[in-house]
Amino acid sequence: MSDPLIKRALVSVSDKTGIVDFCRELSSLGVEIFSTGGTLKALQDSGVKAASISLITGFPEIMDGRVKTLHPKIHGGLLAVRDNADHVAQAVENGIGFIDMVVVNLYPFEATVARPGVSFEDAIENIDIGGPSMLRSAAKNNESVTVLTDSADYPCVLAEMRSSGGRTTRATRLRLARQVFQLTSRYDGAIARYLTGAEGAAPAAAETMTVKLERELDMRYGENPHQSAGFYTLTDGEGTRSFGDYFEKLHGKELSYNNMLDIAAASGLVEEFRGEEPSVVIIKHTNPCGVAQAPTLVEAWHNAFATDTQAPFGGIIAFNRPLDMVTAEAVNGIFTEILIAPSYEEGVLDLLMKKKDRRLLVQKQALPKGGWEFKSTPFGMLVQERDSKIVAREDLNVVTKRQPTEEELGDLMFAWKICKHIKSNTILYVKNRRTFGVGAGQMSRVDSSKIARWKASEVNLDLHGSVVASDAFFPFADGLLAAAEAGVTAVIQPGGSIRDNEVIEAADANNLAMVFTGMRHFKH
């Protein structure tokens, strides 16, 4: 069967990142778009031609939107085998039109239940029913239907359609279908875990856990040349996860054990800024040595690099936007081990591939949120939930007399996202959405603070007007006083010390704004 022409698309997304531009391009390619609820409104408000799904079903959305796409005219249009004469005849007989593309991402169940204090009712309302059903139908019929769940895939699908007269390749449809079943498996697993926890059970205390490991990548050696190593796909109760599911290596030497650790660190941190302003993350030995957000990617790169102008050499750089030529030329001036981006703009790969050993990776989809983390010891296996809980602005507890300004709040939230990705003890200085000083991995929190200040002074970054984040509480006021002396105006920390009052008094005495998150972020 030849690649089918995409004539009709069904679009219904919770995360609307890039959806308007994507659908505008689809429309220009002659694709008829049908949509639901908030997505339909967003498209129509932006001048994109789109029609209600009710025109297909002949039935309105009902029960507060719980029922809108669960209809034979939707699933028949997705599941019909196009070269099966009986299917085609039944579709004609029942007035069912084929649907060639599905663009759906799911209600944010994992993000909802990750928020402290979420109600059971809110969690239940964020269980998507119609979305997974459409995704599974479309993915099952991937020979004929293109299905997208991640905005990172929009550019490559559009590029294929432009170059092939409105079609996608079989390989792309199959890759996207695999992503669907990985997504729905994780999604259902998250719901099952939440409902188990809602009954008061402790999932991590399960008496047995079954895990399957299959070698995916050979490696020359481990952390050091005398250690053998390999990379394995992991199958557990949440489904199967593999490197190839999330990344594609476009260029460079084979990946090493240490590379894989750094890729995990870089992609995990840049994931915090998915859908936000252009962001750049620089990693060395799994620790961030520079992170920044800015109106342009190249500006974010320069700001991140300015945090520490030595550590990025031989480091790993991750971008939350397609890597453009201006940024690529700037990055190309230093030696880097790995670059990770959702895509590379025209001509960028030609430039970067001139350095034959540098690895260039595409991150194909968002990393899974939540789930289990496994760490081996010589005497057994540790299992814990990933540190993926989210602190929102409304969760912050202002404990000082002075409230943080809006600008300070923005920097505090930015710092907190980064803080949990740094080895403990962590002290992090941030100003204007860019790191100014990173103190990582010290046995004493005061030493981490000293290192962060010293690193800032080494590159002539003025800490006056900055904010500071600490991954755990200040056990004494001395750490906070050192930050105040450096010029900090606001502080974010978990709180919970028996000397919290002493620390709060010190903050008030220095006119600092301080917020408690109620959540510690130790990282060993």
From Swiss-Prot:
Entries under Pfam families matching the protein: AICARFT_IMPCHas, MGS
Top-level taxonomic group: Bacteria
Question: What GO molecular function annotations does the UniProt record carry, in alphabetical order?
Answer: IMP cyclohydrolase activity; phosphoribosylaminoimidazolecarboxamide formyltransferase activity
Q: Which GO terms describe its biological process?
A: 'de novo' IMP biosynthetic process
Check the record and name the InterPro entries matching this protein: AICAR_Tfase_dup_dom_sf, Cytidine_deaminase-like, MGS-like_dom, MGS-like_dom_sf, PurH-like
Which Enzyme Commission numbers does its entry carry? 2.1.2.3, 3.5.4.10
What UniProt keywords are attached to this protein's entry? Hydrolase, Multifunctional enzyme, Purine biosynthesis, Transferase
Q: Does the keyword Hydrolase apply?
A: yes
Q: Name one GO cellular component term.
A: cytosol
The protein's annotated catalytic reaction(s) are: (6R)-10-formyltetrahydrofolate + 5-amino-1-(5-phospho-beta-D-ribosyl)imidazole-4-carboxamide = 5-formamido-1-(5-phospho-D-ribosyl)imidazole-4-carboxamide + (6S)-5,6,7,8-tetrahydrofolate; IMP + H2O = 5-formamido-1-(5-phospho-D-ribosyl)imidazole-4-carboxamide
- Xref: CDD domains: IMPCH
Q: Pathway it acts in?
A: Purine metabolism; IMP biosynthesis via de novo pathway; 5-formamido-1-(5-phospho-D-ribosyl)imidazole-4-carboxamide from 5-amino-1-(5-phospho-D-ribosyl)imidazole-4-carboxamide (10-formyl THF route): step 1/1; Purine metabolism; IMP biosynthesis via de novo pathway; IMP from 5-formamido-1-(5-phospho-D-ribosyl)imidazole-4-carboxamide: step 1/1
Instruction: Provide the MGS-like domain boundaries.
Output: 1-149
Q: What is known of its domains?
A: The IMP cyclohydrolase activity resides in the N-terminal region.
- What is the similarity comment for this entry? Belongs to the PurH family.
UniProt name for this protein: Bifunctional purine biosynthesis protein PurH
Native source species? Chlorobium luteolum (strain DSM 273 / BCRC 81028 / 2530) (Pelodictyon luteolum)
